[in-house]
Amino acid sequence: MTTVGVSLFRRSPEKITMKIATFLGLSFLLIASYVLICEAQHPGFQELLILEENMRDPENSKERSCAKPRENCNRMNILCCRGECVCPTFGDCFCYGD
């Protein structure tokens, strides 16, 4: 009985490292899948918030449904109130300029 108990604790460091790496990799994949599923279920959520905010903003009373500087643009036909829509290589497009 003691040999069985002792052998359980005599695992090689390589096996332990592989198990930890596998656990971390699977955890990352699980979190990434949750993020992708959430984005797929709520597409354009941020753009809708911009439109709703602009509808209540007296500064944009003439130019409704437009994005202010540093807000996302060019998705779902959202144009910039002032300035131009800049799209970096990675990430979302945003309004630049005053």
UniProtKB/Swiss-Prot annotation:
Its main location: secreted. It is found in: Secreted. Residues 1-40 form the signal peptide. Residues 41-64 form a propeptide. Disulfide bonds join C66-C81, C73-C85, C80-C95. GO terms for molecular function: ion channel regulator activity; toxin activity. Keywords: Disulfide bond, Ion channel impairing toxin, Knottin, Secreted, Signal, Toxin. Expressed by the venom gland. It comes from the Eukaryota. GO terms for cellular component: extracellular region. Transmembrane segments: none annotated. Belongs to the hainantoxin family. 17 subfamily. Putative ion channel inhibitor. The presence of a 'disulfide through disulfide knot' structurally defines this protein as a knottin. This is Hainantoxin-XVII.
